[in-house]
């Protein structure tokens, strides 16, 4: 079973599980992608069974008719997504007329819109520079942009070089959520493998809590950060365990469905969704029930 993610500290427990040997003997293949755009494309054509996406990207695919459901909440951003500015930009309002680099994703558009509205600005008040996330650091260092809508690990790298935080996901709490989604065909054929993937991720989280130094040392090279940088990045998010996932996903109208409904409405109003998708099959909560039963 193929599982695709971009490089994002909130997905790193999946790779930590592999590094700890928890995938040995299991038919699981992690596919490392350059961006969530690639993950979305792979889900569209069926070349991935499972992927890590933000909730807004999930809504975009559901709107397109891609047959996926959320099976797990990986992380909830609480500062790890941000708008950073160069030292000569004193505040958000000073971004008027400036160049802002942003990845061409629903999340990038959503974060940019939220930051601009917070500053009383509109998109036409700034120069938007489309910029894949793997070019964020180089564009910053060459002065090609005055500000960036970015996330870890680039966020942490840039903060270490003197970037200033103008706006981050703490100002829109609970709205930037990363989830594991599965194609419904995979849910039919491979539910046991999805359960194994989630169980190994939870074991990796337990290792992170019990032996943080070892876990951070293992995670740092893949992310291109120091262990201290990984710890700082993790401080900007919540990593829900099995019990938390049951609270978020299970039952009638669970919290994640409510968040998705609010996010869908905001995306529709901002023109990011031409129409509002049916959320009837947004969540498959079977794994949340199973994992919560196993949570100590």
State the predicted function of each range:
Residues 57, 129, 135-224:
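Pocket-lining segment of extracytoplasmic ligand-binding domains
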Residues 7, 32, 36, 76, ...:
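Solvent-exposed, acidic/flexible segments
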Residues 27, 106-126, 200-236, 280-283, ...:
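Ligand-binding clefts/hinges and TM-proximal coupling segments of bilobed small-molecule sensing domains
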Residues 261-296:
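Conserved C-terminal helix/tail region of periplasmic/extracytoplasmic solute-binding proteins
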Residues 190-272:
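Secondary-structure end/capping motifs
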Residues 1-122, 128-130, 146-150, 174:
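Short, glycine-/small- and polar/acidic-enriched structural segments
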Residues 16, 41, 45, 59, ...:
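Solvent-exposed, polar/charged alpha-helical surfaces in well-ordered, non-transmembrane soluble domains
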Residues 88-93, 117, 125, 137, ...:
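Proline/Glycine/Serine-rich low-complexity intrinsically disordered segments
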């Amino acid at each position: 079973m193929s599982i695709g993610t971009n490089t994002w500290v909130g997905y790193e427990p999946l790779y930590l599980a592999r590094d700890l040997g928890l995938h040995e003997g299991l038919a699981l293949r992690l596919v490392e992608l350059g961006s969530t755009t690639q993950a979305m494309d792979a889900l569209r054509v069926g070349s991935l069974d499972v992927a890590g996406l933000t909730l807004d990207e999930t809504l975009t695919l559901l709107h397109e008719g891609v047959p996926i459901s959320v099976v797990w909440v990986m992380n909830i951003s609480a500062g790890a997504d941000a708008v950073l500015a160069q030292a000569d930009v004193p505040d958000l309002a000073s971004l008027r007329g400036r160049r802002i680099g942003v990845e061409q994703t629903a999340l990038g558009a959503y974060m940019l819109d939220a930051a601009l509205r917070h500053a009383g600005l509109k998109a036409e008040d700034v120069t938007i520079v489309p910029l894949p996330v793997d070019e964020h650091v180089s564009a910053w260092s060459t002065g090609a942009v005055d500000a960036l809508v970015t996330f870890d690990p680039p966020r942490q790298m840039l903060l270490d070089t003197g970037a200033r935080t103008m706006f981050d996901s703490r100002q829109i709490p609970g709205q930037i959520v990363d989830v594991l989604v599965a194609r419904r065909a995979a849910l039919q054929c491979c539910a046991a493998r999805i359960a194994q993937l989630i169980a190994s991720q939870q074991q990796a989280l337990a290792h992170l809590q019990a032996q943080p130094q070892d876990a951070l040392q293992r995670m740092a090279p893949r992310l291109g950060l120091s262990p201290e940088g990984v710890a700082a990045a993790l401080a900007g998010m919540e990593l829900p365990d099995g019990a938390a996932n049951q609270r978020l996903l299970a039952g009638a109208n669970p919290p994640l469905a409510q968040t998705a409904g609010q996010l869908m409405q905001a995306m529709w109003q901002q023109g990011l969704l031409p129409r509002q998708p049916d959320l009837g099959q947004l969540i498959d909560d079977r794994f949340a029930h199973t994992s919560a039963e196993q949570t100590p």
